[in-house]
């Protein structure tokens, strides 16, 4: 399986509900480093997994929807703990929707087998969501 990864970052504010979260129950900020890895079984006619520039732009567009927001005030996350794990899945879903809409060019999204999204809270802690695209 071939893969191509792009990375970016975003900043949010949020809080959690539940004693398991300790002091993170209070409003706090987070800066996430994000990696999106696109995978396919064979390379395209140009020898690529996908256009790296389009992949980077697509990731940036998805993260711009979240950047500098207080997620506690976002209607789409009402009643949810926006944990690192949850956000990895949410970014995956948003990227997958853009892939289905053709954001990486004609036929590229259809050729991709899977996508993996990694959110890094720090150099020693991260979460990921991975899923098939076909």
Question: What positions do the PLM features span?
Answer:
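Charge-rich, low-complexity N-terminal segments
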Residues: 1-134
């Amino acid at each position: 399986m071939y893969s191509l990864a792009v990375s970016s970052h975003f900043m949010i504010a949020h809080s959690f509900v539940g004693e398991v979260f300790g002091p993170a129950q209070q409003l706090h900020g987070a800066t996430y480093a994000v990696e999106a890895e696109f995978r396919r079984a064979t390379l395209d006619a140009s020898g690529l997994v996908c256009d790296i520039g389009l992949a980077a732009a697509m990731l940036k567009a998805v993260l711009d929807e979240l950047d500098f927001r207080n997620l506690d005030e976002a209607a789409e996350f009402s009643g949810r703990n926006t944990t690192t794990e949850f956000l990895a899945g949410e970014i995956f879903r948003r990227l997958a929707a853009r892939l289905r809409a053709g954001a990486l060019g004609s036929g590229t999204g259809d050729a991709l087998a899977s996508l993996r999204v990694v959110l890094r809270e720090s150099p020693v802690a991260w979460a990921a969501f991975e899923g098939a695209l076909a």
